[in-house]
Amino acid sequence: MNKVIYLDNAATTKVAGEVVEAMIPYFTENYGNPSSVYSFASKNKEAITTQREVIADALGAKANEIYFTAGGSESDNWALKATAEAYKNKGNHIITTKIEHHAILHTAEYLEKNGFEVTYLDVDENGMVRLEDLQAAIRPTTILISIMYANNEIGTIEPIKEIGAIAKEHGILFHTDAVQAFGQVPINVDECNIDMLSASGHKLNGPKGIGFLYIRKGVKIRSFVHGGGQERKRRAGTENVPGIIGMGTATARAIRTMEERTTKEAKLRDYLISRVLEEVPYTKLNGHPEKRLPNNANFSFRFIEGESLLIMLDMKGICASSGSACTSGSLDPSHVLLAIGLPHEIAHGSLRLTLSEETTKEEVDYVIESIKEIVTKLRNMSPLYEDFVKKTQK
């Protein structure tokens, strides 16, 4: 197979054709600054309002609760830092988990250095938060719970509705990083008692460099970027109009196609998982076997290095990942895989495959055969595997 097979859609996605078409006029024709008073620019202000409404509808929110940002990392930083600053007179304790994206973990570490206390919850072997652990971690000084909707590496979907209920019961703000979940699973902020939610355009066939933070009306969150009065004086800077158009168009498309698209993805994902587990010995599926994103499969292969597997897959035209794209250059094993209890040597042999609506069965079959061939080759070169075989033959 000579073409590239892209199975790293958790890292980023191809921008959909209709999204590109919707964006182009805002580069070439409707390029006015939305803050300007003349009618040429006011069209852009109206366009932003329309896309804000589209995104709000997708969440069951109000348009004035959607704030555009440069992406998921900014939204996460804003949610944690600005909440901590606004509510520091009420308390200084934040609860999150050990499997969050680094945009949350590193922000939490920053806050710890600035006088806040952070509890990092353990998860079970499937990456699921234990609700009793969350209850036990709550203190009188707890001001924020931040737990991701679905994990970017192993695909586990957290019990968000139950977490939201616990937060509401104790009068604590609840933020969720929904960068991987938005557009892949239905989300309703009221049903789940979500006070803040982060999302990003490039994870749902939209452009890079655009995202949003949902902030429930009444939440006292401080401005994150100071300057002009954009985003209702909470996030200064001339709006990225083409990006906002792309984000809104991608959101509408994701909601419109969700049922058919995710059903197809889940069917192929299950086929991929079943064949790999059956045909590649000493392989483990990471993440919840059922409560997981429809396009995510994450495996650990014993006796091999994940980086070697990735390089050899790349030579066959297959794009995959050993974990988060934000940490793929690191030689350390995934913090997520360590958090679910995998030993270092097994965590090192991980592979994440994330499908798209364009992924075909023919491509999946080719990937499976390639994995079988490469894993066999790498194991035959492994002293650890050789020792294991000798011991089992005694």
Q: What spans do the regions from the language model cover?
A:
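Pyridoxal 5′-phosphate
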Residues: 1-394
